[in-house]
């Protein structure tokens, strides 16, 4: 090694309490730019410490049979620790940010990654971060849409890729009550449609968000385009609404 390389390696080894071999390897990654290498080292060590703390948080709620999984009972305990009732819509927000694959289930790696993304390392910090996100959720349309889209696979039963319409209605009432002016008409339509006995297609679920935005500026659906790319079920709803809902609301 060149003299300057030797001195850099020696200095880095001393500063980071690592072997000369490890110091040399790390410096090489950053072309022997000491400041960059040291900054990256500190960042990595900070992340490793944060991951360790969050793994400990996860372990408080993990299953005895599978330490990398939080199941329903553990999820109840987690929500309780976060001061969130199981009936609260906030459970969906927590599930979204902690990357739950389905209701009442969290996986260690995804949980830790999600908590890190919230800049938290402890349960108390996580509780505060969630409270802050709840406030954002109430007014941030992009976050509202993201959680809405995320909820469809979250609410599906394990091993299933589709959501029953009856269950979908329950989530519509939670997620769209303040954003979809025709929610009551939509639910009334679903209950008399053959779809009530079937699964609601995912694309219909997703497109309903955009439709809810559309009707805010066109509550009578006067400019609705039946030749557009809307799902068939929404076409059928608009026809139903013009015959039943709009007629009733204008009388």
Curated annotation (Swiss-Prot):
Record keywords: Ubl conjugation pathway
Chain ranges of the DCUN1 domain: 49-242
Domain of life according to the entry: Eukaryota
Gene Ontology terms: cellular component: cytosol; nucleus; ubiquitin ligase complex
UniProt keyword annotation of Ribonucleoprotein present: no
A single BP term in Gene Ontology: protein neddylation
Cross-referenced InterPro entries: DCN-prot, DCN1-like_PONY, PONY_dom
Span of domain UBA-like: 5-42
Molecular functions per Gene Ontology: cullin family protein binding; ubiquitin conjugating enzyme binding; ubiquitin-like protein binding
Keyword ATP-binding: no
PANTHER family: DCN1-LIKE PROTEIN 3, RP42 RELATED
Function noted in UniProt: May contribute to neddylation of cullin components of SCF-type E3 ubiquitin ligase complexes. Neddylation of cullins play an essential role in the regulation of SCF-type complexes activity.
Name of protein: Defective in cullin neddylation protein 1
Species this protein is from: Schizosaccharomyces pombe (strain 972 / ATCC 24843)
